[in-house]
A protein has these predicted regions:
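N-terminal glycine-rich FAD/FM-binding segment characteristic of electron-transfer flavoproteins
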Residues: 1-246
Length: 246
């Protein structure tokens, strides 16, 4: 089994977020990065579980620069067989998807796995674009994945229940919560990942179809009010006069 897992970095949720150049650029000063959780906890770990049970390899692919190397090595420490970095800034989703699709096309993977979205942009576009470019089936928001031979069975939530999908390889999926459990790398994996060579390849020429106009912070949340359980009259007055919901 030959699996390709798409890996990207995302700011740690404890990092302070700021913008520069008239709010047109993300200020990376002091920002700590992590592997995007949907890529790491679900797509990568499930891929590793499958190859541990059935044999095979797990390759990660990242579109990025040397600033992405620490998160790539985290994926290697967790257990990925090898890692590819397309040497380019991750621009718009089409650009990123094109780089991944071209590499996947040239290397014939059984399954391409992505996280359902990144926690910084929440775009959820890469998986479907890659599938379209490869002319392969795409299963989104998968929460379970089992493989037998060249047939895979996937499950995902739908309103009121669950949907079970059966698809033949090769195909592309986006992994959601429930696909696997977070795996903490051990010291042996961390040490091995430090010296493992990364396969850095040039980007192919691809048009950018979108661009960032500006960034903005979400509006500040209003302060919460706490009402004692024995002051129902005060609560009713607030709901009526301030919130205007009754």
């Amino acid at each position: 089994m030959k699996l390709l897992v798409c890996i990207s970095k995302a700011p740690d949720t404890t990092s302070k977020i700021a913008f520069t150049d008239g709010d047109t650029k993300f200020d990376e000063n002091g920002v700590q990065y992590i592997v995007n959780p949907y890529d790491e906890w679900y797509a990568l770990v499930r891929a590793l579980e499958l190859t541990e049970a059935n044999g095979g390899t797990v390759t990660t692919i990242t579109v990025g620069t040397t600033t992405d190397d620490p998160t790539i090595r985290k994926a290697l420490a967790i257990g990925a067989t090898d890692a590819v970095r397309v040497d380019a800034e991750a621009k718009d989703p089409y650009f990123v998807a094109k780089q991944i699709a071209e590499y996947a096309k040239a290397n014939s993977f059984d399954i391409v796995l992505t996280g359902k979205e990144t926690i910084n942009y929440n775009g959820a576009q890469i998986g479907s674009m890659v599938a379209e470019m490869l002319d392969q089936p795409f299963v989104s928001l998968a929460q379970k994945l089992e493989v037998s031979g060249n047939t895979a069975t996937l499950e995902r939530d739908v309103p009121g229940g669950a949907e079970v999908v059966e698809v033949n390889t090769p195909f592309v999926l986006s992994a959601a919560k429930g696909m696997a459990e977070q795996r903490i790398p051990n010291m042996r994996g961390i040490m091995a990942a430090r010296t493992k060579a990364l396969n850095v390849i040039p980007a192919i020429e691809t048009a950018e179809l979108t661009s960032i106009v500006s960034y903005s912070m979400p509006p500040a949340k209003s302060e919460s009010k706490y009402i004692d359980a024995d002051k129902m009259t005060e609560l009713v007055e607030i709901l009526h006069n301030e919130a205007k919901v009754i």
